[in-house]
Every structure is written in C-alpha cells, then in structure tokens.
C-alpha cells in the first residue's frame, strides 16, 4: 500500500525528520486560503497521486499569488495526471498539497531504503544526485549510489550514518543532523513495516539545514492487519479497481498491460505461465493466483475480474490440481461463463487431481472452450486464438 506525499511526510515528521511543511486543499478556494498561511512568498502546488514524475507531467507548479494558487488547483483537481509511472489513463487528482517554497538550495541529495532480498536486511541507499530519477542514476552512474546494509540485531549504528554523511559531502553540524535524520528514517521503516522509503530530494538549504522536500513510502500490505492507523490512510481512488476487488476474495491479482488474461493456481506456476505466453509471442494482461485452497466462489470471482478488463482478448486457465480439484475448477469455469457474457476465446489446461473428470465436465458442458494438453500447447493455442 502506497502513501501520498503529505502522508509520508507527516509520518517522517513524527520520527523527528525535518520536512517541507504544507496544507492539503480540496478546492481552489482552500488552496488560496492555504497560500495565505504559507510562510514563504512563493508556494508550491503539488498534485497528490501515487506516482512519481509529477513535475514533468505538470503536477507540481510554483505560484506567487493566492489567485494563482486557486487557478492552478482548480486546473489540477478532477483531472487524471499521466506520468512515466502511470498507465495511459493516469491517476486521479482529488486534492493538492500547498507547500512552502524551499528554494534556492545548496544541493539536492537522495536517501532511500528498501528490504534487500539477497542480504535479507534493510538496505539504505544514498546519492549526491538528488532531484532526478534514481533509476536513471543507477543505470548510467551506479558508482554515485552508496549502499548500507543494516544488521537487524543491532539496528542502524551512528558510525554507518556518519559514513553516509561524509560520502554525501556533508560537514560540520550537518553531520549530526543527518545522523539523527537517517536514524529516524530507519526507526520509521522498521516500526511501520515499510518496504520502500524514498526522500528525493533531500535538500541542503542555503542556511545549511537539511530538509525532506519530498517523500515516498510503500507499506507491506501483508502487515496492514497490525497497522490500523496506517491502513486507514489508504486512498482506494489511487488503486486498481480490479486489484481491490480481488483482495476482497483473497485473490492475488496484479494488472498488467497485455491482452491475454491468466487464471492460475500457485504463484510459481502463474509466473511460468506468463513467461511462456511471452515466449510464444503473447502479452499477459494480469497475474492472478487463485491459491492452493481456492473455492468455487473464488474461482468464479477470479474469472469475472479477468473479464472486467476491456483489454483482455483471450483467457488462459492453467490449473494443476493438488489441494484444488480440477473437477471443482471445471464447474466454477462453467458457472462463471454462464454468469458472464464471454465473447473471447478461453483455453483450459487441467493437470493433476481429477484432471480427467474436469476435462469431461468441460466437454459435456457444450461451451466453446479450447482444451490444451501441457503448458506449451496451452500457450500456443491462446496466442493463436487471440491473433485469429
């Protein structure tokens, strides 16, 4: 689950990090009132969406008067902001952050943290190349990114934070300020089950103070049950509707940009299914794992969710029966097709527990389903069916 910029900043502020202050506005009039309260002559209007690249997309603008603040806000609210991190539809802008202007600054830095799966530790990343896309820095000049792995038994140690500060070119009082900032960021990361934290830019102002000008936080969705205050911050308008619906039925669904819908049991098999679709020249429209203990109702809902995607031109159902019986899957497929007006080809591959019975049920249903023997055969048939 992602947080909005203003939510991320408030969370970081509660751990002692200095932030760019601002006020949320849901209308042009509220933005004008917020401008009057801004301590700087210039204010920054920031569209609040779950995506990076807002500046280049016109989602971040400087305003010098309350009238300008009202005009810019009215132009942003109600529109969809399209950035390099969104799909073609973009993300809806429901409100903006009216923030104080922090510029000019001495320099812009980058500070981030993730859970590194290879070391199985929280890893901090820092760079002198702040204010730009860190992915671009990692690709073109990886030597400019410093990494620090944190031992979970002892946590972030002061000498590690000081070492990062030295590499960032900080000096004097800035060293202690950065140590406090990085320590607070680590504490926030661990205590709130964060899986992604980015402060970009982390600005060094002309007076030498270090301030978080932007903040991005992603929370581990599996931990929301023990984070009620964080869970309450979820903005469902920024989430994919099909992914939200899938979560209600305990389905692991991720929307992609292809045209072949996939329904599979097991995450590994689901990834293999997407790989082989690509191998045969197709593009998967989604990742969908119905799980090892899928029920008939869940399978029906999974099928309906796939078909709600208007880009889907064909569906591949790939089931390996273990705990899940193939005959139950077959009955669920029939029920879903009868409930939903299916106008696209459907390829079904059943293997394992009661596979023969499942195939028989599908054959006797009278529905126009394409049966496949083996994973390669299934991928070839769905790709051919979509191209036909």
Curated annotation (Swiss-Prot):
Binding site for substrate: 265, 322-324
This protein's name: Succinate--CoA ligase [ADP-forming] subunit beta
Top enzyme category: ligase
Gene3D superfamilies in UniProt: ATP-grasp fold, A domain, ATP-grasp fold, B domain, Succinyl-CoA synthetase domains
HAMAP family (UniProt xref): Succ_CoA_beta
Role of this protein: Succinyl-CoA synthetase functions in the citric acid cycle (TCA), coupling the hydrolysis of succinyl-CoA to the synthesis of either ATP or GTP and thus represents the only step of substrate-level phosphorylation in the TCA. The beta subunit provides nucleotide specificity of the enzyme and binds the substrate succinate, while the binding sites for coenzyme A and phosphate are found in the alpha subunit.
Catalytic activity: succinate + ATP + CoA = succinyl-CoA + ADP + phosphate; GTP + succinate + CoA = succinyl-CoA + GDP + phosphate
Any one of the GO BP annotations: tricarboxylic acid cycle
Protein family: Belongs to the succinate/malate CoA ligase beta subunit family.
Cofactor(s), names only, from the UniProt record: Mg(2+)
Key words, A-Z: ATP-binding, Ligase, Magnesium, Metal-binding, Nucleotide-binding, Tricarboxylic acid cycle
Catalytic activity, EC: 6.2.1.5
Natural source organism: Psychrobacter cryohalolentis (strain ATCC BAA-1226 / DSM 17306 / VKM B-2378 / K5)
Positions that bind Mg(2+): 200, 214
């Amino acid at each position: 689950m992602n947080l909005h910029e203003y939510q991320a900043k408030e969370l970081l502020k509660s751990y002692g990090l200095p932030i760019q202050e601002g006020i949320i506005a849901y209308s042009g009039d509220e933005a004008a009132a917020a401008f009057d309260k801004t301590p700087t002559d210039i204010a920054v209007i920031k569209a609040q969406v779950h995506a990076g690249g807002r500046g280049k997309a016109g989602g971040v603008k400087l305003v010098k008067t309350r009238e300008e603040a009202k005009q810019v806000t009215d132009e942003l609210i109600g529109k969809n902001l399209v950035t390099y991190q969104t799909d073609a539809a973009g993300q809806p802008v429901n409100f903006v952050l009216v923030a104080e202007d922090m510029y000019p600054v001495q320099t812009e830095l980058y500070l981030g943290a993730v859970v590194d799966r290879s070391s199985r530790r929280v890893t901090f990343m820092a760079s002198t190349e702040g204010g730009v896309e860190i992915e671009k820095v990692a690709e073109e000049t990886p030597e400019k990114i410093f990494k620090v792995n944190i031992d979970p038994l002892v946590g972030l140690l002061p000498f590690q934070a000081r070492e990062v500060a030295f590499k960032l070119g900080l000096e004097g009082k800035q060293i202690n300020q950065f140590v406090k900032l990085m320590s607070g960021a680590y504490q926030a990361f661990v205590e709130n089950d964060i899986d992604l934290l980015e402060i970009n830019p982390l600005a060094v102002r002309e007076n030498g103070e270090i301030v978080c000008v932007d903040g991005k936080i992603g929370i581990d969705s599996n931990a929301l049950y023990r984070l009620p205050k964080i869970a309450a911050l979820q903005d469902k308008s920024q989430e994919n509707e099909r992914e939200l619906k899938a979560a209600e039925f305990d389905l692991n669904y991720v929307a992609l940009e292809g045209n072949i819908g996939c329904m599979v049991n097991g995450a590994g098999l689901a990834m293999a299914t997407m790989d082989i679709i690509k191998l045969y020249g197709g593009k998967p429209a989604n990742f969908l794992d119905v799980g090892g203990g899928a029920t008939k109702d869940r399978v029906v809902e999974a099928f309906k969710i796939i078909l709600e995607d208007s880009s889907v031109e064909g569906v591949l159902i790939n089931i390996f029966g273990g705990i899940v019986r193939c005959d139950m899957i077959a009955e669920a497929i029939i029920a879903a097709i009868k409930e939903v007006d299916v106008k696209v080809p459907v390829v079904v591959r059943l293997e394992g527990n009661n596979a023969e019975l499942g195939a028989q049920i599908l054959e006797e249903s009278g529905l126009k389903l394409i049966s496949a023997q083996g994973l390669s055969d299934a991928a070839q048939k769905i790709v051919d069916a979509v191209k036909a």
